[in-house]
Amino acid sequence: MCGAIVLLLLVGTSPAPVEGLRCRTGEGPSADDVKRIVRTCMNKITNAGTMGEWGQRDRNGEEQQMMRDYGRSHRRRKRQYYGGQTSGSSSSGSAGEHSYNGRASPQYGEAGQGGNGTRSGGNSSSSSSSTIERDRACLMQCFFEEMKATNADGFPEKHKVLHVITKDIREHELREFYVDSIQECFHMLGLDNRLKDKCDYSMRFVTCLSDRFETNCDDWESVTSAMF
């Protein structure tokens, strides 16, 4: 599998493709390589003391559980990040895509944690969910680091990501699709000057790529089913 397929498998999407390309390739890291990188990243986050509930799980199956759990919340995150506005002004272009119920989307780890911790019922559950969301976002950022595709500050870097993801793609049309998708997603994220966190940025980038794959890859469902 090529780099983009690996990243999107970690997101755990369940797409409903409309038409288009055969995006699955036989190149790139194997499933064992993916699991090794995921374990490495989970260990890093655990050792940093930020794994929250993930640190309590059975290590034998946690990487697959992470992928499956992540798919359940993917649709909700897409509504929040890429079309969650419900009121207020929404200018054309990307502004509406980056709104969160009419406000700036929160950084991972901030949602549901109000300034003094006095949010109404469900605050504890919301805080726990937010911690797990944060951990998963940082797992994705670590994945970019392990693929040598980040800049000095740990953010995914466009030219490095382009190289890592497209270097093994030989089919011209498919390669163009990957290049266009990566460039478009970096462009969209560049329009949001609120993105100052490398974990949040990494997950937003992968979510953007996932949207492109859902729309354009008519074999994406077979890719996810093959993984699980």
From Swiss-Prot:
Region annotation (Disordered) ranges: 50-131
CDD domains documented for this protein: PBP_GOBP
Biased composition (Gly residues): 111-120
GO terms under biological process: sensory perception of smell
Primary residence: secreted
Intrachain disulfide bonds: C138-C199, C185-C208
Compositional bias ranges of the Low complexity kind: 83-99, 121-131
Leader sequence residues: 1-20
Family classification: Belongs to the PBP/GOBP family.
Protein's recorded name: General odorant-binding protein 71
Species: Anopheles gambiae (African malaria mosquito)
